[in-house]
């Protein structure tokens, strides 16, 4: 398959490569030795990614994201993948699930994440169910204004200093013509 990059995609590739050379690669040895990204360094990387227009590139322009297409995101992810996930996770790609925010959730979660003011983590995968939502065991029950979560998650995405968590959990069971289905 021959994929010819547009001039815009070539510019994105050049921008990401320069960013990686200036902001990421110089810190690889330090991070490898420490076994983690120091918070100050992570926040510095995040701020530079925002300045470079790389932060939230995956989200639409109408919410303040970069509005990049799948080819651009593949180019970016390929370059990011040349370093440790611990480092490149600070460049920032808020989960597209935030686009499901409604009403006050937009101001509380979506827009601050797009601007880099908040970070989310995403917890779906479970030890026995993997990412099979219908096979998961984690439940959530309403308790006044709160939710009580019961269950286990692993392989959590975005755990670098999160401000909030998106946790996939069953909130009940509905009867359907095909049998009981978990309400998620």
Over which residues does each language-model region extend?
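A short, Trp-centered hydrophobic/proline-enriched beta-strand micro-motif
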Residues: 116-124, 168
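Internal helix-loop-helix
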Residues: 46, 50-117, 157-164
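A short core secondary-structure module
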Residues: 150-184
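Short, contiguous pre-domain boundary segments
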Residues: 1-4
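A structural signal for short hydrophobic beta-strand segments in well-ordered beta-sheet cores
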Residues: 138-141
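N-terminal glycine-rich anion-binding loops that anchor highly charged ligand groups
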Residues: 15-24, 49-51
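C-terminal helix-coil-helix/basic helical segment that borders enzyme active sites and/or dimer interfaces
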Residues: 28-36
């Amino acid at each position: 398959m021959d994929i010819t990059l547009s001039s815009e995609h070539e510019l994105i590739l050049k921008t990401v490569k320069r960013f990686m050379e200036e902001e990421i690669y110089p810190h690889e040895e330090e991070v490898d030795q420490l076994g983690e990204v120091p918070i100050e360094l992570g926040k510095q990387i995040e701020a530079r990614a925002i300045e470079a227009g790389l932060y939230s590139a995956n989200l639409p322009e109408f919410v303040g994201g970069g509005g990049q297409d799948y080819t651009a995101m593949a180019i970016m992810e390929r370059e990011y993948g040349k370093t440790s996930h611990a480092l490149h996770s600070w460049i920032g790609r808020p989960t597209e699930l935030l686009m499901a925010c409604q009403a006050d959730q937009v101001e509380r979660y979506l827009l601050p994440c797009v601007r880099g003011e908040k970070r989310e983590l995403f917890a779906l995968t479970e030890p026995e169910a993997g990412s099979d939502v219908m096979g998961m065991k984690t439940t959530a029950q309403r308790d006044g204004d709160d939710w009580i979560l019961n269950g286990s998650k692993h392989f959590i995405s975005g755990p670098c200093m999160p401000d909030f968590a998106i946790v996939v959990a069953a909130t009940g069971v509905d009867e359907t013509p095909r049998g009981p289905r978990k309400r998620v």
